[in-house]
């Protein structure tokens, strides 16, 4: 009897405990919301040995930065290229205004040291000028572009023009013409007066020396053409007694009542400082391209140089 009561009590206790555990037990889950997010690596598939199953293995890769890595330097900003400045256009100087001064106040250009082949050749073949009668040659223009006013035709043919106290000038310009190198040498005279009262204010005369090639060691004179009354004397080749080495000799002469002209001569003459067209100041070139000297004209300016070479061409 006592044993039955004891067993019943034990059984009652066990049932009560089991019921309490059953009541209090719940399914527990892992809260993933507090975990870091992971990036899954690509899936790796593995086959089982019997080929019945395929196992997939995913390896989580943390996106958290590696503290051992150094930060990439911030690149310097690329600046836009600076555009080249637009050059200021050269203003149009407008028409040339002639400034005239006394013929004996025009200062010549000093003869520059020749640099180019054409300059050296022009100096080498610079001619001698012999004044038979009439005026001596004078500078026509100065560095500022002022030009000589010339002289009236009165008094003796050489009155007032027997030479400038500043020195004289010969002007030059050269270039190829029909495969021959032409060097033009020009002189200015304040008046052309064969005798008192006749002639004209201002005079320009020139001679063209034609050579084979300025670049060879010993260029050869092929022809000489002195200017004469709007035309030319043409010597191809020149007479031997009119050449001194490589120097052409020309005379400024008037056969009355004709105006003055140049011609080849055997008489020795004088040299003048040579200034080539490209060596003149800009104002001097503008003046010689623009100033009206009356009946005579500037032989070597832009409008006359090529036409005069064509007219003086000495070869048939």
UniProtKB/Swiss-Prot annotation:
Signal peptide: 1-19
Motif placement: Conserved undecapeptide motif I: 182-192
Keywords assigned: Glycoprotein, Secreted, Signal, Virulence
Residues modified by glycosylation: 24
Span(s) of short sequence motif Hepta-peptide GHRHDWE motif II: 199-205
Induction remark: Expression is induced during infection of host leaves, but stays low compared to other NLP effectors.
Ranges where the record places region Disordered: 62-100
Localization (cell): Secreted
Origin superkingdom: Eukaryota
Chief location of this protein within or outside the cell: secreted
Residue stretches of biased makeup (Pro residues): 74-94
GO cellular component: a single term: extracellular region
Pfam hit, one: NPP1
Function: Secreted effector that contributes moderately to virulence during infection by P.capsici. Does not cause visible reaction of C.annuum for several days after inoculation, but by 7 days after inoculation, small necrotic lesions become visible. Leads only to chlorotic areas, without necrosis at 7 days after non-host N.benthamiana leaves infection.
Family stated for the protein in its record: Belongs to the Necrosis inducing protein (NPP1) family.
Record remark: domains: Key residues/motif important for the effector activities are degenerated in most NLPs, including the nlp24 peptide consisting of the conserved region I (11-aa immunogenic part) and conserved region II (the heptapeptide GHRHDWE motif) that is important for phytotoxic activity.
Name of this protein: NLP effector protein 8
UniProt source species: Phytophthora capsici
């Amino acid at each position: 009897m006592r044993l039955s009561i004891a067993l019943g009590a034990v059984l009652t206790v066990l049932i009560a405990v089991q019921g309490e555990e059953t009541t209090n037990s719940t399914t527990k889950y892992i809260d993933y919301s507090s975990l870091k997010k992971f990036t899954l690596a690509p899936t790796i598939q593995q086959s089982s040995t019997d080929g019945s199953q395929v196992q997939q293995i995913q390896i989580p890769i943390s996106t958290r930065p590696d503290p051992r890595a150094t930060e990439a330097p911030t690149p310097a900003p690329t600046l836009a290229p600076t555009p080249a400045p637009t050059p200021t256009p050269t203003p149009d100087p407008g028409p040339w205004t002639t400034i005239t001064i006394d013929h004996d106040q025009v200062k010549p250009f000093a003869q520059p040291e020749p640099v180019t082949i054409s300059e050296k050749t022009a100096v080498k073949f610079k001619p001698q000028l012999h004044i038979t009668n009439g005026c001596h040659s004078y500078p026509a223009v100065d560095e500022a572009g002022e030009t000589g006013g010339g002289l009236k035709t009165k008094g003796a043919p050489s009155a007032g023009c027997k030479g400038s106290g500043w020195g004289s000038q010969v002007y030059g310009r050269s270039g190829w013409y029909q495969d021959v190198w032409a060097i033009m040498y020009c002189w200015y005279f304040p008046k052309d007066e064969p005798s008192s009262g006749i002639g004209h204010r201002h005079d320009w005369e020139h001679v063209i020396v034609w050579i084979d090639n300025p670049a060879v060691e010993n260029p050869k004179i092929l022809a000489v053409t002195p200017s004469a009354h709007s035309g030319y004397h043409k010597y191809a080749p020149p007479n031997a007694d009119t050449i001194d080495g490589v120097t052409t000799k020309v005379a400024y002469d008037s056969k009355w009542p004709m105006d003055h002209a140049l011609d080849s001569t055997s008489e020795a003459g004088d040299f003048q400082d040579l200034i080539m067209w490209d060596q003149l100041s800009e104002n001097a070139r503008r003046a010689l391209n623009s100033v009206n000297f009356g009946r005579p004209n500037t032989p070597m300016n832009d409008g006359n140089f090529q036409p005069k070479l064509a007219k003086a061409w000495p070869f048939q």
